[in-house]
Amino acid sequence: MNTAPESDLAAGPVQLPHSPLPAYYRDEVEHQRFLRRIFDETASDYDRIERVLAMGTGPRYRRMALQRAGLAPGDKVVDVGIGTGLLAREACAQIGAAGSLVGIDPSPGMLKQVALRGIQLRVGRAEQLPCADGEADFLSLGYAFRHVSDVGRAFAEFYRVLRPGGKLLVLEISRPESRIGNALLKAYMRILVPVIARIVARERATSELWRYYWDTIEACIAPAQIIAALEAAGFEAVRRHTELGIFSEYSAVKPESSGLLK
Protein backbone atom coordinates (compact mmCIF):
# COMPACT_ATOMS: atom_id res chain seq x y z
CA MET A 1 0.00 0.00 0.00
CA ASN A 2 1.36 3.42 -0.94
CA THR A 3 1.59 6.01 1.80
CA ALA A 4 3.43 9.31 1.84
CA PRO A 5 7.08 8.91 2.91
CA GLU A 6 7.77 10.13 6.42
CA SER A 7 10.59 12.34 5.15
CA ASP A 8 8.25 14.12 2.73
CA LEU A 9 5.67 14.63 5.44
CA ALA A 10 8.22 16.22 7.74
CA ALA A 11 9.15 18.91 5.21
CA GLY A 12 7.88 22.47 5.57
CA PRO A 13 6.61 24.51 8.53
CA VAL A 14 4.01 23.03 10.84
CA GLN A 15 0.57 24.67 10.74
CA LEU A 16 -1.41 23.92 13.90
CA PRO A 17 -5.22 23.82 13.77
CA HIS A 18 -5.34 25.75 17.02
CA SER A 19 -2.97 27.40 19.46
CA PRO A 20 -1.38 25.05 22.04
CA LEU A 21 -3.46 24.22 25.11
CA PRO A 22 -1.07 23.87 28.08
CA ALA A 23 -3.91 22.94 30.41
CA TYR A 24 -3.95 19.56 28.66
CA TYR A 25 -0.44 19.00 27.24
CA ARG A 26 2.98 20.67 27.03
CA ASP A 27 4.28 19.50 23.66
CA GLU A 28 3.26 17.47 20.63
CA VAL A 29 4.30 14.16 22.17
CA GLU A 30 2.05 14.82 25.16
CA HIS A 31 -0.66 16.09 22.80
CA GLN A 32 -0.80 12.79 20.92
CA ARG A 33 -0.68 10.84 24.18
CA PHE A 34 -3.53 12.95 25.57
CA LEU A 35 -5.71 12.47 22.47
CA ARG A 36 -5.15 8.71 22.48
CA ARG A 37 -6.06 8.47 26.16
CA ILE A 38 -9.09 10.76 26.14
CA PHE A 39 -10.71 9.16 23.09
CA ASP A 40 -9.92 5.60 24.14
CA GLU A 41 -11.36 6.21 27.62
CA THR A 42 -14.53 7.97 26.45
CA ALA A 43 -15.35 5.91 23.35
CA SER A 44 -18.17 3.95 24.99
CA ASP A 45 -19.87 7.21 26.04
CA TYR A 46 -19.48 9.15 22.81
CA ASP A 47 -22.65 8.20 20.93
CA ARG A 48 -24.79 8.50 24.05
CA ILE A 49 -23.62 12.04 24.75
CA GLU A 50 -23.92 13.04 21.09
CA ARG A 51 -27.56 11.94 20.95
CA VAL A 52 -28.39 14.01 24.02
CA LEU A 53 -26.56 17.13 22.83
CA ALA A 54 -27.84 17.01 19.25
CA MET A 55 -31.37 16.14 20.39
CA GLY A 56 -31.63 13.52 17.67
CA THR A 57 -30.85 15.90 14.79
CA GLY A 58 -27.31 14.64 14.11
CA PRO A 59 -28.08 11.94 11.52
CA ARG A 60 -30.21 14.24 9.36
CA TYR A 61 -27.61 17.01 9.38
CA ARG A 62 -24.76 14.65 8.51
CA ARG A 63 -26.85 13.15 5.71
CA MET A 64 -27.59 16.58 4.22
CA ALA A 65 -23.95 17.69 4.51
CA LEU A 66 -22.77 14.63 2.58
CA GLN A 67 -25.35 15.28 -0.11
CA ARG A 68 -24.33 18.93 -0.42
CA ALA A 69 -20.69 17.84 -0.84
CA GLY A 70 -21.62 15.56 -3.73
CA LEU A 71 -21.37 12.05 -2.26
CA ALA A 72 -22.82 9.67 -4.85
CA PRO A 73 -24.00 6.05 -4.97
CA GLY A 74 -21.11 3.69 -5.65
CA ASP A 75 -18.42 6.06 -4.36
CA LYS A 76 -15.28 4.76 -2.68
CA VAL A 77 -15.11 6.70 0.59
CA VAL A 78 -12.27 7.28 3.05
CA ASP A 79 -13.59 8.64 6.35
CA VAL A 80 -10.72 10.13 8.35
CA GLY A 81 -11.30 10.38 12.09
CA ILE A 82 -14.19 7.95 11.81
CA GLY A 83 -14.56 7.83 15.59
CA THR A 84 -17.57 5.68 16.44
CA GLY A 85 -18.86 5.83 12.87
CA LEU A 86 -21.54 8.53 13.07
CA LEU A 87 -20.68 10.17 9.74
CA ALA A 88 -19.70 6.86 8.14
CA ARG A 89 -23.14 5.42 8.90
CA GLU A 90 -24.82 8.10 6.79
CA ALA A 91 -22.19 7.76 4.07
CA CYS A 92 -22.77 4.00 3.81
CA ALA A 93 -26.49 4.56 3.38
CA GLN A 94 -25.82 6.94 0.49
CA ILE A 95 -23.16 4.98 -1.39
CA GLY A 96 -25.09 1.71 -1.20
CA ALA A 97 -23.83 -1.80 -1.84
CA ALA A 98 -21.89 -0.70 -4.93
CA GLY A 99 -19.75 1.66 -2.86
CA SER A 100 -17.09 1.03 -0.24
CA LEU A 101 -15.85 2.79 2.88
CA VAL A 102 -12.55 2.80 4.73
CA GLY A 103 -12.60 4.29 8.22
CA ILE A 104 -9.39 5.61 9.75
CA ASP A 105 -8.79 6.72 13.34
CA PRO A 106 -5.80 6.85 15.71
CA SER A 107 -7.94 5.61 18.62
CA PRO A 108 -8.39 1.82 18.84
CA GLY A 109 -11.01 2.48 21.50
CA MET A 110 -13.12 4.49 19.08
CA LEU A 111 -12.70 1.94 16.30
CA LYS A 112 -14.03 -0.79 18.60
CA GLN A 113 -17.31 1.14 18.85
CA VAL A 114 -17.91 1.20 15.08
CA ALA A 115 -20.88 -1.07 14.43
CA LEU A 116 -21.00 -1.05 10.62
CA ARG A 117 -20.79 -4.10 8.41
CA GLY A 118 -18.86 -4.35 5.18
CA ILE A 119 -16.37 -1.55 5.84
CA GLN A 120 -12.62 -1.56 6.46
CA LEU A 121 -11.14 -0.05 9.61
CA ARG A 122 -7.53 1.09 9.81
CA VAL A 123 -5.55 2.67 12.63
CA GLY A 124 -3.91 5.83 11.33
CA ARG A 125 -3.58 9.59 11.46
CA ALA A 126 -4.59 12.32 9.03
CA GLU A 127 -0.95 13.32 8.52
CA GLN A 128 0.03 9.87 7.20
CA LEU A 129 -2.97 7.98 5.92
CA PRO A 130 -2.67 4.20 5.44
CA CYS A 131 -4.17 4.52 1.95
CA ALA A 132 -3.01 4.16 -1.63
CA ASP A 133 -2.61 7.12 -3.96
CA GLY A 134 -5.94 7.99 -5.60
CA GLU A 135 -7.82 5.40 -3.55
CA ALA A 136 -10.90 7.51 -2.80
CA ASP A 137 -13.68 9.15 -4.77
CA PHE A 138 -14.76 10.99 -1.63
CA LEU A 139 -12.88 11.80 1.57
CA SER A 140 -14.50 13.08 4.75
CA LEU A 141 -13.24 14.47 8.05
CA GLY A 142 -16.03 14.88 10.59
CA TYR A 143 -15.33 17.19 13.55
CA ALA A 144 -11.73 16.01 13.82
CA PHE A 145 -9.91 18.89 12.11
CA ARG A 146 -9.08 20.40 15.52
CA HIS A 147 -7.26 17.22 16.51
CA VAL A 148 -4.74 17.04 13.64
CA SER A 149 -1.12 17.96 14.33
CA ASP A 150 -0.34 19.73 11.06
CA VAL A 151 -3.00 21.21 8.79
CA GLY A 152 -0.78 21.37 5.71
CA ARG A 153 0.38 17.77 6.04
CA ALA A 154 -3.15 16.52 6.58
CA PHE A 155 -4.56 18.37 3.57
CA ALA A 156 -1.65 17.18 1.41
CA GLU A 157 -2.50 13.62 2.40
CA PHE A 158 -6.18 14.15 1.59
CA TYR A 159 -5.13 15.44 -1.84
CA ARG A 160 -2.89 12.41 -2.40
CA VAL A 161 -5.52 9.85 -1.43
CA LEU A 162 -8.29 11.36 -3.56
CA ARG A 163 -8.44 10.47 -7.25
CA PRO A 164 -8.43 13.34 -9.77
CA GLY A 165 -11.93 14.80 -9.60
CA GLY A 166 -12.44 13.38 -6.10
CA LYS A 167 -14.40 15.36 -3.53
CA LEU A 168 -13.56 16.44 0.01
CA LEU A 169 -15.81 17.31 2.95
CA VAL A 170 -14.54 18.69 6.26
CA LEU A 171 -17.13 19.22 8.99
CA GLU A 172 -16.27 21.46 11.93
CA ILE A 173 -17.79 23.70 14.57
CA SER A 174 -16.85 27.36 14.27
CA ARG A 175 -17.09 30.16 16.78
CA PRO A 176 -20.09 32.46 16.23
CA GLU A 177 -19.15 35.86 14.83
CA SER A 178 -21.19 37.81 17.37
CA ARG A 179 -19.97 38.29 20.94
CA ILE A 180 -23.32 37.27 22.36
CA GLY A 181 -23.48 34.14 20.23
CA ASN A 182 -19.94 33.20 21.18
CA ALA A 183 -20.64 33.75 24.88
CA LEU A 184 -23.78 31.62 24.73
CA LEU A 185 -22.05 28.78 22.89
CA LYS A 186 -19.11 28.92 25.30
CA ALA A 187 -21.43 28.71 28.31
CA TYR A 188 -23.22 25.77 26.71
CA MET A 189 -20.12 23.85 25.66
CA ARG A 190 -17.77 24.73 28.53
CA ILE A 191 -20.24 24.59 31.44
CA LEU A 192 -23.54 22.90 30.60
CA VAL A 193 -22.22 20.09 28.40
CA PRO A 194 -19.67 18.82 30.96
CA VAL A 195 -22.44 18.82 33.58
CA ILE A 196 -24.66 16.78 31.26
CA ALA A 197 -21.71 14.48 30.57
CA ARG A 198 -21.20 13.85 34.29
CA ILE A 199 -24.87 12.90 34.62
CA VAL A 200 -25.23 10.75 31.50
CA ALA A 201 -21.72 9.37 31.01
CA ARG A 202 -20.29 6.21 32.49
CA GLU A 203 -16.64 7.22 32.16
CA ARG A 204 -15.04 9.88 34.37
CA ALA A 205 -12.99 11.32 31.51
CA THR A 206 -16.05 12.20 29.41
CA SER A 207 -16.66 15.59 31.03
CA GLU A 208 -12.97 16.40 30.48
CA LEU A 209 -13.32 15.54 26.80
CA TRP A 210 -16.15 18.01 26.32
CA ARG A 211 -14.29 20.79 28.14
CA TYR A 212 -11.36 20.13 25.82
CA TYR A 213 -13.77 20.09 22.88
CA TRP A 214 -14.82 23.67 23.54
CA ASP A 215 -11.28 24.86 24.24
CA THR A 216 -10.17 23.60 20.81
CA ILE A 217 -13.13 25.35 19.16
CA GLU A 218 -12.27 28.62 20.89
CA ALA A 219 -8.58 28.37 19.92
CA CYS A 220 -9.15 27.09 16.36
CA ILE A 221 -7.80 28.98 13.36
CA ALA A 222 -10.27 31.11 11.41
CA PRO A 223 -12.37 29.66 8.56
CA ALA A 224 -10.48 31.85 6.08
CA GLN A 225 -7.23 30.15 7.12
CA ILE A 226 -8.77 26.71 6.61
CA ILE A 227 -9.94 27.71 3.13
CA ALA A 228 -6.49 29.11 2.31
CA ALA A 229 -4.82 25.90 3.48
CA LEU A 230 -7.09 23.80 1.27
CA GLU A 231 -6.28 25.98 -1.73
CA ALA A 232 -2.56 25.81 -0.92
CA ALA A 233 -2.80 22.01 -0.95
CA GLY A 234 -4.06 22.19 -4.54
CA PHE A 235 -7.82 21.85 -4.10
CA GLU A 236 -10.27 23.72 -6.31
CA ALA A 237 -13.87 24.86 -5.83
CA VAL A 238 -13.18 25.37 -2.12
CA ARG A 239 -16.34 26.52 -0.37
CA ARG A 240 -17.69 26.95 3.14
CA HIS A 241 -21.36 26.38 3.92
CA THR A 242 -22.67 27.12 7.40
CA GLU A 243 -25.74 26.05 9.34
CA LEU A 244 -26.96 28.03 12.36
CA GLY A 245 -23.80 30.10 12.16
CA ILE A 246 -21.64 27.46 13.86
CA PHE A 247 -21.72 24.25 11.81
CA SER A 248 -19.17 24.68 9.01
CA GLU A 249 -18.94 22.45 5.94
CA TYR A 250 -15.76 22.90 3.90
CA SER A 251 -16.05 21.24 0.50
CA ALA A 252 -13.43 21.03 -2.22
CA VAL A 253 -12.47 19.09 -5.35
CA LYS A 254 -9.14 17.67 -6.50
CA PRO A 255 -8.55 18.90 -10.07
CA GLU A 256 -9.16 16.40 -12.86
CA SER A 257 -5.68 16.97 -14.28
CA SER A 258 -3.32 16.89 -11.34
CA GLY A 259 -0.30 15.14 -9.91
CA LEU A 260 -0.25 13.57 -6.48
CA LEU A 261 0.62 16.90 -4.88
CA LYS A 262 0.43 20.47 -6.04
Task: Name each model feature, range by range.
Residues E127-L139:
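A short acidic, Gly/Pro-enriched loop at the edge of an enzyme's catalytic core
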Residues M55-P73, E90:
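Conserved alpha-helix/loop element of class I SAM-dependent methyltransferases that forms part
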Residues E30, R175-A229:
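C-terminal alpha-helical "lid/dimerization" subdomain adjacent to the S-adenosyl-L-methionine
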Residues G166-I173:
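Conserved beta-strand signature within the Rossmann-like core of class I S-adenosyl-L-methionine
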Residues G152-P164:
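A short glycine-rich, Lys/Arg-flanked "PGG" loop and its adjoining helix->strand segment in the class I
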Residues K76-L129:
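Class I SAM-dependent methyltransferase SAM/SAH-binding core
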Residues A233-K262:
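Core SAM-dependent methyltransferase catalytic element
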Residues D137-V151:
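A short SAM/SAH-binding and catalytic strip from SAM-dependent methyltransferases
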